[in-house]
């Protein structure tokens, strides 16, 4: 599950911040593999490359157990 509704609720999904949408999702504006903000392999706030990863924290909070919860945008680790 990737949390389709996560786009509007901080991206509560697995792996990233939902699937598609304005701010979150694979290849979306704020999330996805190799996107710019928030999540993905080389995201601004999270992902495998920049500032986040497995069990890490970040400003935007995405990825596996990263930032704030398991693949969510706002919530748990903070």
Curated annotation (Swiss-Prot):
Induction: Expression in skin and hair follicle is regulated by HOXC13 and by GATA3. One of its GO terms (cellular component) is intermediate filament. Strong expression in narrowly defined pattern restricted to the lower and middle cortical regions of the hair shaft in both developing and cycling hair. During hair follicle regression (catagen), expression levels decrease until expression is no longer detectable in follicles at resting stage (telogen). The keyword Repeat applies. One of its GO terms (biological process) is keratinization. Transmembrane segments: none annotated. Keywords: Keratin, Repeat. Residues 3-76 are annotated as: 25 X 2 AA repeats of G-[YCGS]. Belongs to the KRTAP type 6 family. In the hair cortex, hair keratin intermediate filaments are embedded in an interfilamentous matrix, consisting of hair keratin-associated proteins (KRTAP), which are essential for the formation of a rigid and resistant hair shaft through their extensive disulfide bond cross-linking with abundant cysteine residues of hair keratins. The matrix proteins include the high-sulfur and high-glycine-tyrosine keratins. Interacts with hair keratins. This is Keratin-associated protein 6-5.
